[in-house]
Amino acid sequence: PYNHLFASGALDIIGFNYHDDWFMGVPTNFPGMPFIVTESVSGLMTRGYYRMPSDEPVVCPERWDRPYYDPSFSCSSYDNCRVPWGNHHEGTLKLVQNNDFISGQYIWTGFDYIGEPTPYGWPARSSYFGIVDLAGFPKDVYYMYQSQWTDKDVLHLFPHWNWEEGQDMDLWAYYNNADEVELFINGKSQG
């Protein structure tokens, strides 16, 4: 995006919030300038809540000025729910990792917080943005970041195993830093 302050050359580093579609214009519009994503992602999730199908993206609210409504007041933890101006965690992380001109990112947010209830209006009272919930428990996507930025072994399986008999769910052995993972359920390989 064009910005008089950026264009003046007065800054040693540039950055902007969200809008991953703008990232690729940085090397052309600001050649040689270090760039950091100053506020990124805005993925929405409720720890322990899984909406099927897991690969169906949800943008909510569809517009920032119209609160989203779902009677559960929950957002799926499959990293498939985001606000219109943001992206899913995995999507932005891939952009950062695959483009050398991006120095890094600040994720919005580390923790859920009271106030700015998004995507729901009243009676919701908090955000759903954090990779850690209000009680301090990591959400599933926390382990995605951990698997990318630590030397210790990481393998995170989800969702929980508290389903009703016959209820469909997608099991992910997705957040890991192993060369390969094979999942067995009751002695049978799932791949």
Q: What is each PLM-predicted segment?
A:
Residues 1-191:
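Extended substrate-binding grooves/exosites of carbohydrate-active enzymes
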